[in-house]
Swiss-Prot record:
Written domain comment of the UniProt record: Proteolytic cleavage leads to an important conformation change. This reduces the affinity for steroids.
Protein name, entry field: Corticosteroid-binding globulin
Major subcellular site: secreted
Sorted UniProt keywords: Glycoprotein, Lipid-binding, Secreted, Signal, Steroid-binding, Transport
Family according to the record: Belongs to the serpin family.
Amino acid sequence: MPLLLYTCLLWLSTSGLWTVQAMDPNTTYVNMSNHHRGLASANVDFAFSLYKHLVALSPKKNIFISPVSISMALAMLSLGTCGHTRAQLLQGLGFNLTGRSETEIHQGFQHLHQLFAESDTSLEMTMGNALFLDGSLELLESFSADIKHYYESEVLAMNFQDWATASRQINSYVKSKTQGKIADLLSGLDSPAILVLVNYIFFKGTWTQPFDLASTREENFYVDETTVVKVPMMLQSSTISYLHDSELPCQLVRLNYVGNGTVFFILPEKGKMNTVIAALSRDTINRWSAGLTSSQVDLYIPKVTISGVYDLGDVLEEMGIADLFTNQANFSRITQDAQLKSSKVVHKAVLQLNEEGVDTAGSTGVTLNLTSKPIILRFNQPFIIMIFDHFTWSSLFLARVVNPA
């Protein structure tokens, strides 16, 4: 289907991986305000900060992450921390602990989890959480109860003395939960762990207006001034929400998939990618949303699959979350049997875009007979993808596509 998203966040000697939220349109604005709006703003700010750090570290590579999954996993992890480690982790995620209690933070994530469970049945989405603990350790009941209450996480005993077998079992667990889309999660991580926390998601989105399958053609994609690659280029000719930004050097469109998802495709002018990325913020998204107009557009977007694995340790340290990776780490609310240390924070995500959508009676249609010349917008050079839940404006996925081939 047109939009397939799989994501994993792994934290070794604790780890995590999480998920997309889709809000029931019938959920009241009051409930959203009470449970989630403050959480969403912190999550979006953290998302853009993390995204900008990753882009700076890999200026010539594709980037694709699920920011809310990272926020979710780290917030869950904070339930097992104490003292400075805990305060640093929550503050690094963007939460003002003087204005919002820790209980309210976890209640906000709990509400998000409920929204996932109650999401539109037209979305194909599988998500969940699991904690794998070495059988020689005793998990504190308070931590077990907290992660069950707020994050619907389960605890599974594992023999980490046999790391090869344990890693295969965890890989198999995640693979089965994500319909085979996330495999070999622990591949290449050969340091035995005693605690592995996993949050997983498989998500398949379907365009409300599909691209024209018969119109997909191989075209040039200009990676940079010296590199040109061939890619299958999809076409949608229809009425689309479009903006040629007067403040930033870019054009953009907003598309929807069935359910509650909104996708922004942003095309910076040549050489202006960093300028646009530097300006990404909640205010920019609000301004773009207000400025979009319904326009007749011939939209060309590459049919693309992007995957990546990111070791987030250095990035999180730069963002102020440093205790997790030092001897100062305090995880005494998980177990008192051992001093847990984090060895890695690894995020894995995959994005697939193709043509298919849902045939809807009375829809605008894929092809229009136009009386005026349409806007022609070709995403044939590096571009940005942002996927939000359009009721809560939580940042689901962020991508920078440098080379789709």
